[in-house]
Amino acid sequence: MQGNVARQRAAVIEVRKQLASDIAAHAQSLGENPTAIPGLALYRLTTPTACLLTTYEPSVTVFAQGRKRINLGGIEYFCDGSSFLLSSIDVPVESQILEASEQVPLLSMFLRLDMPTVREVLSREDLPEPEISVQNRGVAVGETTVGLLGACARLIELLETPEDIPFLSHLIQREIVYRILRSPQGGRLRAIATAGNLSHRTARAIAWLRANYAKPLRMEELAAVARMGVSTLHHQFRGLTAMSPLQYQKQLRLQTAR
């Protein structure tokens, strides 16, 4: 038993090294490095940072090395080379790079999640139903596996053969979505993608509020977008974002002002 665990850990470390090498090869500039694959960006950072306000969109960020802190409504999440960050909704957060240097830069892969692709995977795969809870925040940190790391490495390696991107990139992205959905954090993503349930309807209200943050907030109007009562929406909204709709709007306005 212990031997199997040791072999699994060794395999994860080996694939993570390959992912770090792939990211480093294609992320030559500091900060964000857009790629020829739609929705895929690679990051290289060499210094710690102060807290920065930013808005996460539905996405998965896989870390190969370095360390980062995320603050969502007073709840802290820490990401390092053994983890991935899942954001299933549009949400304002504070982020801070904790560990990064010239010798060991923070290297990560950002992939925007395409909800039609998520629904496509859900319709074809026999995945277990998630336990829906208001404690299922829209942001979560999970542990990377050989399967997830390997799929991410293969997606980045497509950049070396651009002619393969149109055919293979979608297939590999479907695998990445599948790996996330099979993880303990997958229920969060499934709940958002599944039409009709409270999380999906709340996400619709969140998207509307982000698009209309400059307007005065009227809870009755927002509740109508979500097709639920005001008190239910308030409860669900706080469950996903760790803040009220008004606090969410203020965070968006603050970020825009900066």
Roles of regions detected by a PLM:
Residues 9-47:
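N-terminal, Lys/Arg-enriched amphipathic/low-complexity engagement segments
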Residues 32-129:
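N-terminal regulatory/effector-sensing and dimerization cores
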Residues 35, 188-192, 218:
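Short, hydrophobic secondary-structure boundary micro-motifs
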Residues 51, 135-143, 193, 221:
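A ubiquitous short alpha-helical element
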Residues 60, 176, 209, 233:
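Conserved hydrophobic/aromatic pocket- or pore-lining residues that grip, position, or stack substrates
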